[in-house]
């Protein structure tokens, strides 16, 4: 993947297209968490891809490509939300959440007991499979803060499930 990123940085359009295709599912899921509207998601993805293409030469370290790409997307999503002047609630999950004990509807209700920030961290960690380090970069938080919030969210969810 590093070689592909380097090729894209050097102007290889096909390499760039392959990079975007490799990350399309993560891009869509992240945009869905923020926007939950297909038209807004399409706009955010289009703007993100264009911005990434125009600025990929500025990427300092290839190992941070995905984090950099996701940061661009999150900023685009926030811009769209500001333009529409509505709050981003994260109570819907991406399809494909599987749990033997809880169905999707129950998961949605369960996560509502968390504050927005903790809910976002839990979703990025468990459903989008981001690492704590990636989440800290995406949300511009210290990784220890992300770990603490994740731990507290787990504890709160366990407590609610036991009731």
Question: Where are the language model's segments positioned?
Answer:
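C-terminal flanking helix
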Residues: 24, 28, 49, 115, ...
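Arg/Lys-rich amphipathic alpha helix in sigma70-family domain 2
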Residues: 57-60, 71-90, 152
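A short pre-motif secondary-structure segment
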Residues: 121-125
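N-terminal module of bacterial RNA polymerase sigma factors
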Residues: 1-25, 107-108, 112, 138-139, ...
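DNA-recognition helix of helix-turn-helix
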Residues: 74, 78, 127, 133-163
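Internal acidic/polar
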Residues: 79, 83-112, 131
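Sigma70-family region 2
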Residues: 9, 36, 47-64, 84-85
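Structural recognition of an alpha-helix C-terminal capping motif at a helix-to-coil junction
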Residues: 29, 43-50, 54, 63-75
């Amino acid at each position: 993947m590093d070689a592909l990123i380097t090729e894209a940085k050097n102007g290889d359009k096909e390499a760039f297209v392959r990079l975007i295709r490799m990350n399309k599912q993560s891009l869509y899921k992240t945009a869905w968490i923020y926007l939950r509207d297909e038209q807004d998601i399409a706009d955010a993805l289009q703007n993100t891809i264009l911005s990434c293409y125009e600025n990929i030469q500025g990427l300092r370290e290839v190992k941070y490509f995905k984090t950099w790409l996701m940061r661009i997307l999150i900023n685009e999503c926030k811009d769209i939300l500001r333009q529409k002047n509505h709050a981003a609630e994260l109570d819907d999950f991406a399809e494909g959440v599987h749990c033997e004990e809880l169905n999707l509807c129950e998961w949605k209700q369960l996560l509502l007991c968390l504050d927005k920030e903790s809910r976002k961290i839990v979703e990025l960690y468990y459903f989008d499979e981001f690492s704590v380090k990636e989440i800290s970069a995406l949300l511009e938080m210290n990784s220890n803060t992300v770990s603490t919030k994740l731990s507290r969210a787990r504890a709160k969810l366990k407590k609610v499930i036991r009731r």
